[in-house]
């Protein structure tokens, strides 16, 4: 079972800045979480993310894990090239009552790390072999990515971008979840809105949503589909 853990605003600690560590950090960058990296060495990619203020980095040789106790992370990931150290990192996470992950030992970890198809940091599709074969998971991801990038259209991505705007508006005056859901589905059928989303005119799309919303909530009125 694949679970999408909600990490927004939470602290995730990654220990180890090699290839595996950077792979995990790239995935975390899409989650709008706080990323704290500890590694013995830096590299150009780490320096770039630090300069962009996407991660916090501390150059540190790990000999004792007690320094972690001053933090309150939701997750600690051991991504070093030392299997025993990664296991200790996982156990430290358990002692601190947070999720733990050891990169080369997924069977003892709280979760396996799936191979992700990431489309414009909006849609993520996970492919997992439950830690049994990362090579095959990567193979499937590469093949599936070509298909999904054809299936998921530009207007679909733009609809996701403005979805929160429409949903927040709906919550102000549409009283029940079922009615709000009905309103949200109705937006997908509006030709003017679809054209705005297709051409990337998100400002015009929001204006159109406001018009449709006003029609929907008009006292004693009936939603007028002006397609």
Residue ranges and their predicted role:
Residues 18-20, 83-84, 131:
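Residue-level detector of alpha-helix initiation sites
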Residues 23, 31-49:
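NAD(P)-binding Rossmann-fold cofactor-contacting core
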Residues 53, 71-75:
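Short acidic/histidine-rich motifs immediately flanking catalytic phosphotransfer sites
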Residues 60-65:
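Conserved SAM/SAH-binding loop
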Residues 75-82, 86-113:
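ADP-ribose/adenylate-binding Rossmann-like module
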Residues 129-227:
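An accessory alpha-helical subdomain
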């Amino acid at each position: 079972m694949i679970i999408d853990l909600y990490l927004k605003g939470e602290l995730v600690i990654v220990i180890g800045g090699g290839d595996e560590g950077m792979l995990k950090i790239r995935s975390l960058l899409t989650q709008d979480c706080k990323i704290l990296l500890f590694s013995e060495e830096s590299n150009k990619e780490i320096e770039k993310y630090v300069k962009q203020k996407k991660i916090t980095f501390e150059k540190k040789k790990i000999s004792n894990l007690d320094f972690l106790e001053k933090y309150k992370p939701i997750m600690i990931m051991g991504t070093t090239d030392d299997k025993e150290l990664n296991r200790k990192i996982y156990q430290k996470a358990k002692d601190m009552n947070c999720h733990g992950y050891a990169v080369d030992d997924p069977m003892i970890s709280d979760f396996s790390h799936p191979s992700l198809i990431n489309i414009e940091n909006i849609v993520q599709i996970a492919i997992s072999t439950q830690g049994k074969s990362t090579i095959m998971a990567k193979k499937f991801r590469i093949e599936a990515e070509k298909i999904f990038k054809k299936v998921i259209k530009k207007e679909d991505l733009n609809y996701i971008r403005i979805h929160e705007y429409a949903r927040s508006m709906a919550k102000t005056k549409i009283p029940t979840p079922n009615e709000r859901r009905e309103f949200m589905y109705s937006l997908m059928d509006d030709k003017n809105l679809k054209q705005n989303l297709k051409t990337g005119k998100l400002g015009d799309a929001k204006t159109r949503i406001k018009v449709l919303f006003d029609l929907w909530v008009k006292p004693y009125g009936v939603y007028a589909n002006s397609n």
